């Protein structure tokens, strides 16, 4: 009783075909194929050595020393 036979599989396939239509199923399978090929491409790229990281340059302007910035402890809106 718990086994699925060929007739049950054919009926399920027919219901799916009627619900989604032939065009929608072919679109889904095409998208699935693109996903698999993209996944394989990603795996192949992982094997390649990574390019060296770009050098990060420091700031182009000089920062003020911390003492100069904190001379007046009042908030900026209350100065004056």
UniProtKB/Swiss-Prot annotation:
Residue ranges spanning the membrane: these are 1-21
As for subcellular location, the record says: Cell inner membrane
Choose any GO biological process term that the UniProt entry carries and state it: protein transport by the Tat complex
The answer, when asked if Transport is one of the entry's keywords, is yes
Report the membrane topology from the UniProt record.
Single-pass membrane protein
First-listed, main subcellular location of the protein, grouped into a coarse class:
membrane
Q: Which Pfam families match?
A: TatA_B_E (PF02416)
Q: Where is the composition biased (Basic and acidic residues)?
A: 58-80
Report the GO terms under cellular component: TAT protein transport complex
Coiled coil residues, start to end: none
Keyword annotations from UniProtKB, A to Z: Cell inner membrane, Cell membrane, Membrane, Protein transport, Translocation, Transmembrane, Transmembrane helix, Transport
Molecular functions per Gene Ontology: protein transmembrane transporter activity
Q: Which InterPro entries match?
A: TatA/B/E, TatA/E
Q: Where is this region: Disordered?
A: 38-80
Any idea what job this protein has?
Part of the twin-arginine translocation (Tat) system that transports large folded proteins containing a characteristic twin-arginine motif in their signal peptide across membranes. TatA could form the protein-conducting channel of the Tat system.
User: Which NCBIfam families does this UniProt record tie to the protein?
Assistant: tatAE
What does the annotation say about its assembly with partners? The Tat system comprises two distinct complexes: a TatABC complex, containing multiple copies of TatA, TatB and TatC subunits, and a separate TatA complex, containing only TatA subunits. Substrates initially bind to the TatABC complex, which probably triggers association of the separate TatA complex to form the active translocon.
Report what the protein is called.
Sec-independent protein translocase protein TatA
């Amino acid at each position: 009783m718990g086994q699925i036979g060929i007739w049950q599989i054919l009926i399920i396939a027919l219901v799916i075909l009627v619900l989604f239509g032939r065009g929608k199923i072919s679109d889904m399978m095409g998208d699935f194929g693109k996903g698999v090929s993209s996944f394989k491409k990603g795996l192949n790229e992982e094997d390649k050595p990574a390019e060296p990281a770009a050098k990060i340059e420091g700031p182009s302007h000089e920062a003020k020393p911390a003492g100069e910035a904190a001379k007046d402890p009042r908030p900026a809106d209350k100065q004056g």
